[in-house]
Amino acid sequence: FSYTVTDNIVTLNEENTKSVNVNRFLLDQISENSNDFILKLPLINESFLDVNMKKFSVLSPEHKLIIETSNGKETVDYIPNFQSYYISYEGNSIGTFLCFENSIVISYKYNNRQFEINKIDNEFLLFDINDCLISKTFSCEVEKKIEQLSAEENYPESSSASPKCLELAVEVDQHTRNTFSSNTTTTNWAHAIIAGVSQVYASEV
């Protein structure tokens, strides 16, 4: 990553928005074969934090993609085009790094502030979630899903000897589906939300 100048400000305080360049060679390398690696994570003060990245998956072998059509529900094949990593700093999980469709989404917490790196208007921006002018950010969608789960009292709890296990389904309505270019793109978005929720639950174990 490197920092660049931008006029695209998505926060009330312009100091809470930074434009970053993504090293495409690094992105390709990650997509191909990296399971664990060290990353220099960009911070809002234009410095970097050395963090550990560890690959994980939210997809089970029984994963199904079900599409509602005029003829009823259809189960279709899904070829994963999605990589997810936990971001760890000093032994603690602080966020997720998601790589799909030749792009990335990063969400992490540092110094009690929640940050996100996402592609907005064809530009990668790092911004403070709590100062953001955009209502439907990735981090906000993850928080909404967590609140929904917390309100439900019947989700499975694991024993203290084993990690928490959640079975989640994400239902996408027609309006939301039409904001994406394909079923694969829509599915990747849903998996990204689940991966974000997974990181929060994993960090609480």
What feature does the model see in each segment?
Residues 85-88, 106-108, 124-129, 134-135:
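Generic recognition of long tandem-repeat/solenoid scaffolds
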Residues 4-19, 125, 130-205:
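Fold-level signature of zinc-dependent metallopeptidase catalytic domains
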Residues 1-119:
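N-terminal prosegments of processed precursors
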